[in-house]
């Protein structure tokens, strides 16, 4: 048994070298919808490089609806998405968190004097909303929040991209309800304030999930998910 220990240790070292060599030769492809690409992914990729040194990571940023087909074609190894409203039997989803929402306010807007806002504060305020076709989660959330408050949103403009929405806020076209991580997009004069419900709790109704092809096996993806699960609370702030 004593003689076998060096052999076992050598075998483990060889296995590690083979695994690391394979990682160095492979490109690991992560898809992320824009909010996750802005807030969650940078620190995750940084830490993943420490777990798997030498691995080349390719980040593909796109809308959730466009990322899911790329999983099925093999163009992506994993994706961080808003889970779809229709079943996807070929894709495995693991819920990560419900992202909070914030209100983006134009330069000098009186509501910026508040530390936090309720939907009622946005009554009659011109609103920029996402396109319902390309961003159904965000659009439906905005409309539902006003409906629950028995209010009709004053829609001034629709736009698809978060950057465009925030730029329009900066141009004083209106305010916008956006995901928390969008607040990391810096546009001159735009102020972000947390959106809370009547109980004073953050409005957290934008789900975020990890997705991959159901039944597939990938040790790098497993390593990434282990890291993500262990640091999710840290990454979410």
Report the location of each language-model feature:
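Hydrophobic hinge/microswitch elements
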Residues: 63-68, 72-76, 132-193
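Central regulatory/effector-binding core of bacterial HTH transcription factors
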Residues: 24-87, 159
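Secondary-structure junction motif
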Residues: 127-149, 218-226, 235-236
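Alpha-helical "hinge/linker" immediately C-terminal to small N-terminal DNA-binding modules
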Residues: 1-20
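Flexible hinge/capping segments at coil-to-helix
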Residues: 22, 90-101, 105-127, 222
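Short loop->beta-strand "edge-of-pocket" segments that line small-molecule binding or catalytic clefts
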Residues: 29-31, 101, 117-137, 232-233
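A late-sequence structural motif
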Residues: 40, 183, 191-237
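Short beta-strand->loop
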Residues: 92-102, 177-183, 187-204
